Every structure is written in C-alpha cells, then in structure tokens.
Amino acid sequence: MHPGDGHTAACLIGWPAAHSRSPLIHHYWLRTLGIPGGYSIESVPPEGFAEFVLNLRAHGYSGANVTIPHKERALQLTQPDDRARAVGAANTLYYDGDVLRSTNTDVEGFIANLDASAPGWDRTPHAVVLGAGGSARAVLFGLLERGIERIALANRSLERAQALADLFGERVVPIAWTDAPAALPGAGLLVNTTSLGMKGQPSLDLDLEPLPSDATVADLVYVPLETELLAEARGRGLRTADGLGMLLHQAVRGFELWFGARPHVTAELRALVEADLAAK
C-alpha cells in the first residue's frame, strides 16, 4: 500500500531509517485489526526535513514517526504537547484539523511497559535512574507524572544530571555515578537509560544486592533482549521490564492517532519482533 491510494498512510522519517522495526509493528496491527492503511519508511536528509514535514499531507501521509537525527527539529516545526516539550524531542506527528501537532510517545511507552511487566511498580516512593540523556528525560517525565516522590539521577557527568534536575524540579536529585550503589537501598525501581550493556558496548557494572526484594529493574536496551542487568535482577527474584517492551508500547499511541483504533501489544507481536531481531 502506498501513499495517495485513498487509504490512511503514515511513515517513519529518519536519516537513515532502513533498519527500523516500526513497519513490522504497524503492519501487524493493520493486518490484525483489518484496517486498510499503510506505513512506509522515508529517508530524508536534514536539509530536506522541514519541507517534507511541512508538506506531509502533500506527500500522502496523515502522520509520521520521527527518528534520529530529526526529533529536535520536529519539535520546532510542529505544535508540541507538554510531553514533547519536556523531553525536548518529538517522535510522533499527527494532524488535528489542519494543525500539525507532535508528542513524544517514549513517556507512555516506558510507563505502559512497566505497568504490563510489573503491575504495582509505582507503589514505591523512590527510584534510581542511570543516565541523563534524551531517554532519561522521557523516563523522568513519566515517573514524576506517575507520582514518584524522589528520583536519584546518576550520571558520569554530574553537570548533565544537575541540568535535568534543574529542569524537572526538586524531586529529581542528581548524584555522582559512583554514588549509585548507595542510592539503591530503599529504591523500589531502578532504570538504566544508558547504552551500557548493549551489544558492542561495555557492561553495566552495578551490584543489585542492596535493592529491596520487591524492587523492579527496567533496562531500555533491547539488543540483547536480556541484558546482564536484567539477568542478574531475574536471578535475584526481582521483577523486570525490558527495552523491547518499551519499543512496542511506545508505538501504540501513534497508531491510534493515525488510524483511529487503539492496538494491543500481544505475545504474537513480541514474538514477531524478537524473530526479526534474531535474524539481523
């Protein structure tokens, strides 16, 4: 199915964008929900991004996902919601009448994955977040929105952690990376937003022994599916939430905005994406 054939179509805009799993996810939902629609990949260089986005309908699309390196620029070219503004990046574009709006679905993807993987995780008042990059901003916004009272934010650059604390308020407490172990006792949630533990990256060296026995450990990395951090957490009997779950759940909102039906993250969909990851 192609843009302009009379059916609703959305796309992923990136540079490059060829290895995204988004088409696999959205085509699965279109097929299983019986919706005539399409989802394509559009590789658009930075110098052509503004023209493409501002003429999205002329290109045949009613909405889009946006990935690297365009997410900050997308924020400037659209009418962003509070989540996109707080995160500082937009990953989902949609029309509200003739107004092109944007949001960041990483926030609800992260929270929905926690809800599905570890129901009741939000009963804890304290959390520890590792890393202070773009992903951390989405995580912090979601945790604060959900009512977490205190978040220790550990980063190798304390200045970057302090900058996010200044942005999000006094409930976010910046700490040195080496102080992360001391923050674990009493923390009901630990979240890794760094690339440590990803295939080809150094391991995340952190002893989970100080965590409470009912804590939840989340890792945004999904290659490998089970990082060393998650393996250790499971070995200790802790509940876990992996990066693939977040990837799947963050796609839900965009699909709903474009195609008018709210899809579900199913075991079948997860198995489909796992098989695709294993084949690469």
Curated annotation (Swiss-Prot):
Gene3D superfamilies listed in its UniProt record: Leucine Dehydrogenase, chain A, domain 1, NAD(P)-binding Rossmann-like Domain
Binding residue positions for shikimate: 20-22, 67, 91, 106, 222
Catalytic class of the enzyme: oxidoreductase
SUPFAM superfamilies: Aminoacid dehydrogenase-like, N-terminal domain, NAD(P)-binding Rossmann-fold domains
Catalytic activity, as annotated: shikimate + NADP(+) = 3-dehydroshikimate + NADPH + H(+)
EC number: 1.1.1.25
Protein name in UniProt: Shikimate dehydrogenase (NADP(+))
Active-site residues, record numbering mapped to chain: 71 (proton acceptor)
Similarity comment: Belongs to the shikimate dehydrogenase family.
GO cellular component, one term: cytosol
GO terms classed as biological process: amino acid biosynthetic process; aromatic amino acid family biosynthetic process; chorismate biosynthetic process; shikimate metabolic process
SUBUNIT field: Homodimer.
Pathway as given in its UniProt record: Metabolic intermediate biosynthesis; chorismate biosynthesis; chorismate from D-erythrose 4-phosphate and phosphoenolpyruvate: step 4/7
HAMAP family: Shikimate_DH_AroE
Residues annotated as binding NADP(+): 82, 131-135, 220, 243
InterPro entries: Aminoacid_DH-like_N_sf, NAD(P)-bd_dom_sf, SDH_C, Shikimate_DH, Shikimate_DH-bd_N, Shikimate_DH_fam, Shikm_DH/Glu-tRNA_Rdtase
Sorted UniProt keywords: Amino-acid biosynthesis, Aromatic amino acid biosynthesis, NADP, Oxidoreductase
Any one GO MF annotation of this record: NADP binding
Presence of keyword Cytoplasm: no
Role: Involved in the biosynthesis of the chorismate, which leads to the biosynthesis of aromatic amino acids. Catalyzes the reversible NADPH linked reduction of 3-dehydroshikimate (DHSA) to yield shikimate (SA).
